[in-house]
């Protein structure tokens, strides 16, 4: 289940925002009890893709990025 501040990737290109498949972003808002999400994406130069903040992404469009903690 996806939740606030999860790191996700977009499964397919979004031509409306210019976000490409595989781009990592962070969930910044959960809508309708998890039926949709606002995701903040950045381009390869580190610039925020503003249009992504006005787009609702469904869980089917997103893939959670699993991270492993390494303790030293």
Give residue ranges: language-model regions.
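Basic/aromatic-rich interaction segments and small domains that mediate binding to polyanionic partners
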Residues: 3-65, 70-71
């Amino acid at each position: 289940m996806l939740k606030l501040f999860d790191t996700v990737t977009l499964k397919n290109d979004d031509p409306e925002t210019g976000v490409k498949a595989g781009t990592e972003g962070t969930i910044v808002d959960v809508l309708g009890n998890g039926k949709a999400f606002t995701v903040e994406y950045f381009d390869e130069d580190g610039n925020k893709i503003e249009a992504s903040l006005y787009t609702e992404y469904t869980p089917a469009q997103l893939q959670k990025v699993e991270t492993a903690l390494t303790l030293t």
